[in-house]
Amino acid sequence: MSKFDFLTSGDFRGAEEFMEKQKRYGSLKSEELESIPESEIVSAVTSWIESKFAEDWHDMGRVINSLPTPCINVYCADYISKEIRDGGFGQAFFNTSRDFIGIAAEGFRAVGYPKLGDVIEQALKINYDSGKKAAGRSIEDFLAFAANDDYKTVDKDFCRVFDEGKFNRLAKDYILRYKKYFGKAEP
């Protein structure tokens, strides 16, 4: 969940928790990774990555593109899984890009969750075949774009296959395998 999600939700209780994690993990060190619980490690590394963004996140794309591949894989997979679980593939395509979603598919495969990568590839094919692209950025534009049910089946497939516990377990193994890329290294 990004800091901007709290502006559109009525739940500001989670905002404090989000900001506390941002503060705590913004200076994450790679030596700390093994001690972080499985249920929190993805949040820890995404908070560390997001701490590199400017306050308004205008440089998000540049920062993500500058990261090592293992960091990109985990970040994109986590980000897109939240978009899909929150509002389906329609929301994911409206809020991000085909490239970002494609990177998430590769991220799921890299961490060892290929079925999710396959579901995302199906959604990308549907999106390409339909020729539909999000036009505009208003709430009306979003509602019009998201109103189509082209993604109904892949939305259900993603939610059926995705298991947060499994993703966290696979991601922790992956993060520890590539821990030199996550967090600040001790001198």
Question: In which residue ranges do the predicted regions lie?
Answer:
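Membrane-interface interhelical connector segments
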Residues: 2-7
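Extended, alpha-helix-rich binding/interface surfaces that flank or overlap catalytic cores
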Residues: 8-75, 81-86, 90-100, 107-187
